[in-house]
């Protein structure tokens, strides 16, 4: 976005990642285009502007496992949009990650307490040991109501890896015309409700009323 001339405010909970971002911006000659802020998505008090054209939540809503925290983070972002501003938010899909689990950790299925908690609640059991990848996987049916309750008008919801979650590495190796034709097809079908939940990630786009 900065390369396209937009002024950007980038927020992350990790000071270390903000430092990495700062170094890359300097290397690219874009440090004057981007303001960097270390903050929790649930408290954007340091971001005082209320007239952003767009806000991108590319992680907080699937790392916050408590529903109230997700709602708080979403409200913080929406409150900083101008009227008509766009919000983009990413989710892990409840069932889209199963292909990865089957391929990389087939023994997961034997921990039935974990399996049932994931299927019904989208997260690990409450008594699961701390550490590792901590995430919430949303059911597709909850995404639109969550956003519209915050005063957003839904523009579209799409699966990010529609129909290819089990083998997107093959797509990533494609080049030229084949890659473009596959991209066009996947974009066309990405909002089909029958396959959206099979994507690893789901993208919501909404407009502030």
Which residues does each predicted region cover?
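A short SAM/SAH-binding and catalytic strip from SAM-dependent methyltransferases
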Residues: 53-68
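A short glycine-rich, Lys/Arg-flanked "PGG" loop and its adjoining helix->strand segment in the class I
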Residues: 71-86
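Conserved class I S-adenosyl-L-methionine
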Residues: 86-118
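Short alpha-helix
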Residues: 132-157
